[in-house]
């Protein structure tokens, strides 16, 4: 499994999680620490300007330990309703295209899969990532306009 953190300019971090690993608060906090280092290296000045992170209510995301770590980082948590893939940019923008790209391919080992995922993400222009974030703004506005009622494509 891969956890991908990205913004309108591109990928910040891809954290590949070994098969069979349970993602609990400890594991997720380690990933967030990696993300913070990635932001320091890839987006100079972003940490001082402020970071917002979009989270659903999965247990590792809302665990006391995770919330405390994000507060220590000074990051703003943006939540979205549970079971709302229409409001999760990775679910409606990134993963469908990645799945399409990988469809029908055969890989001899996990490293080959990881390499191909990294290659796919690296080959996307900043404008592609920006489009995913812009779609979020449009989808959120639709949700607001409908007083929170379900929005289909």
Task: Enumerate the predicted regions with their spans.
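Surface/interface recognition patches
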Residues: 1-153
């Amino acid at each position: 499994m891969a956890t991908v953190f990205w913004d309108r300019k591109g990928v910040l971090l891809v954290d590949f999680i070994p098969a069979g690993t349970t993602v609990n608060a400890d594991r997720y906090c380690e990933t967030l620490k990696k993300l913070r280092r990635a932001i320091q290296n890839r987006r100079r000045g972003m940490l001082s300007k402020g970071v917002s992170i979009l989270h659903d209510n999965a247990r590792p995301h809302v665990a006391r330990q995770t919330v405390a770590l994000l507060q220590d980082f000074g990051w703003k948590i943006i939540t979205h309703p549970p079971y709302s893939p229409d409001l999760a940019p990775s679910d409606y923008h990134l993963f469908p295209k990645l799945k399409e790209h990988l469809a029908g391919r055969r890989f001899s080992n996990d490293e080959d899969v990881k390499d191909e995922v990294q290659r796919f993400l690296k080959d996307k222009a900043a404008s592609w990532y920006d489009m995913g974030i812009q779609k979020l703004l449009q989808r959120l506005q639709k949700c607001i306009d409908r007083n929170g009622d379900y929005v289909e494509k």
